[in-house]
Amino acid sequence: QYVKDGGTLVVTFKSGFANENVKVHVDAQPHILKNALGISYNQFTFPRDVKLAGKLYGEARVFMELLKPEGAEVLAGYEHYNWKGYAAITRNKYGKGTAYYLGCMTDDATLQNVIKDALGSAGVELSGYSYPVIVRKGTNDLGKTIRYFLNYSGSEQAVTYKYGDAEDVITGKEIKAGTELKIPAWDVRIIEA
């Protein structure tokens, strides 16, 4: 229902495989999630040197399900002579929402790409900044956007402020797009727009 009502859901392999008593469902997997995900499977294997290919590229690791799309868009399939006819990662529009399914353990870069796509589908703004500077966003009681630039390192960090005109809440100084923000070690800059 969550996806049908407009939610974005990311599901990984073995989800919906068994009930709360660990009894494996005997029908097509992933049982109760099958319609929302737009896929089914009834076979799995353990990959050895299996690459992923399609809109996403990467590597299948540890475990892989042999997915059969039933309306879902295939983002990646298995690049392997035995498994090339099966999907590995899918995206499905269901009702007003979107559901993603990862039928295998992937490499980190592939997983990040799926998560970025899902966040975009959910309307989540990605900051474009990365560790050790993490940005969090909220709205204050006046309806203004507040961004917290958190430095999670023992050395000063400098980032370029890429949003519209704003003010540093602590210093009261005006901040314009393109301004270099220096964030002391283990500190924060709070910017209000």
PLM region descriptions:
Residues Q1-A193:
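A conserved amphipathic helix/loop scaffold
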